[in-house]
């Protein structure tokens, strides 16, 4: 083991200078008893064993615990609804971003057409004064008519799909009415044809 005899402190630029270091050899040093690392007091292991004791809860901790247990069903319900609605919300946001991008790079003549279609809706609303059914039918009808003038191919596809859906709904309604008719009015028909009424 080397022992440094001369120390020098100076600026960092002077650290590149060379100088001599005098050290004593192992033969000159007196023999010392070596100490193992685990014998040092720094590394000594305490002999007593510690035991974990949980501190008693305070009133604030108890009230927070009760509040968490009370709110847990509601938070789990909210998380479930959020996970169910997250894809729908993301698709709605994506649709909004796509619409915004389309409106930023709109084809020529799009905004005048949109203005005419909107004006047709306002005219339908003005002509529908008085009746609630007219207010529900006239504005979309006028807007649909104006849109079909500018976009005839899309209007044809829309009418075909809407016609099929309306036919299906009408057929379902007819079946429901027929079932109700058979249940309610055939029973009363049997009373008229009973032998006591002849």
UniProtKB/Swiss-Prot annotation:
UniProtKB keywords: Endoplasmic reticulum, Glycoprotein, Golgi apparatus, HDL, LDL, Lipid transport, Membrane, Mitochondrion, Mitochondrion inner membrane, Proteoglycan, Secreted, Signal, Transmembrane, Transmembrane helix, Transport, VLDL
Membrane-protein topology: Single-pass membrane protein
InterPro entries, sorted: MIC26/MIC27, MIC26/MIC27_animal
Glycosylation sites (chain numbering): 162
Major place of residence: mitochondrion
Post-translational modification as stated in the protein's UniProt record: O-glycosylation; glycosaminoglycan of chondroitin-sulfate type.
A GO CC term assigned to this protein in UniProt: mitochondrial inner membrane
Keyword Cell wall biogenesis/degradation: no
Signal peptide: 1-25
One GO BP: cristae formation
Location of this chain's protein in the cell: Mitochondrion inner membrane; Secreted; Mitochondrion; Endoplasmic reticulum membrane
Segments passing through the bilayer: 108-128
Function: Component of the MICOS complex, a large protein complex of the mitochondrial inner membrane that plays crucial roles in the maintenance of crista junctions, inner membrane architecture, and formation of contact sites to the outer membrane. Plays a crucial role in crista junction formation and mitochondrial function. Can induce cardiac lipotoxicity by enhancing mitochondrial respiration and fatty acid metabolism in cardiac myoblasts. Promotes cholesterol efflux from macrophage cells. Detected in HDL, LDL and VLDL.
Subunit structure: Component of the mitochondrial contact site and cristae organizing system (MICOS) complex, composed of at least MICOS10/MIC10, CHCHD3/MIC19, CHCHD6/MIC25, APOOL/MIC27, IMMT/MIC60, APOO/MIC23/MIC26 and MICOS13/MIC13. This complex was also known under the names MINOS or MitOS complex. The MICOS complex associates with mitochondrial outer membrane proteins SAMM50, MTX1 and MTX2 (together described as components of the mitochondrial outer membrane sorting assembly machinery (SAM) complex) and DNAJC11, mitochondrial inner membrane protein TMEM11 and with HSPA9.
Family to which the UniProt record says this protein belongs: Belongs to the apolipoprotein O/MICOS complex subunit Mic27 family.
Protein name: MICOS complex subunit MIC26
Species the sequence originates in: Bos taurus (Bovine)
Phylogenetic classification of the source organism: Eukaryota, Metazoa, Chordata, Craniata, Vertebrata
Gene: APOO
């Amino acid at each position: 083991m080397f022992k440094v005899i001369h120390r020098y402190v100076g600026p960092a630029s002077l650290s590149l200078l060379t100088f001599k270091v005098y050290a004593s050899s192992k033969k000159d040093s007196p023999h010392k008893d070596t100490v193992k690392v685990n014998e040092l007091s720094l590394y000594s292991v305490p002999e007593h064993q510690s035991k974990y004791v949980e501190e008693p809860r305070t009133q604030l901790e108890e009230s927070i615990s009760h509040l968490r247990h009370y709110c847990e069903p509601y938070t789990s319900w909210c998380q479930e609804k959020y996970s169910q609605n997250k894809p729908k919300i993301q698709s709605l946001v994506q649709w909004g971003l796509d619409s915004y991008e389309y409106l930023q790079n709109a084809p020529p003549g799009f905004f005048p057409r949109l203005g005419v279609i909107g004006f047709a809706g306002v005219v339908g609303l003005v002509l529908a004064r008085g009746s609630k059914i007219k207010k529900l039918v006239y504005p979309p009808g006028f807007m649909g008519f104006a849109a079909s003038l500018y976009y005839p191919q899309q209007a044809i596809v829309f009418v075909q799909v809407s016609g099929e859906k309306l036919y299906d709904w009408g057929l379902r309604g007819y079946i429901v009415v027929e079932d109700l008719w058979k249940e309610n009015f055939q029973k009363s028909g049997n009373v008229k044809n009973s032998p006591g009424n002849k």
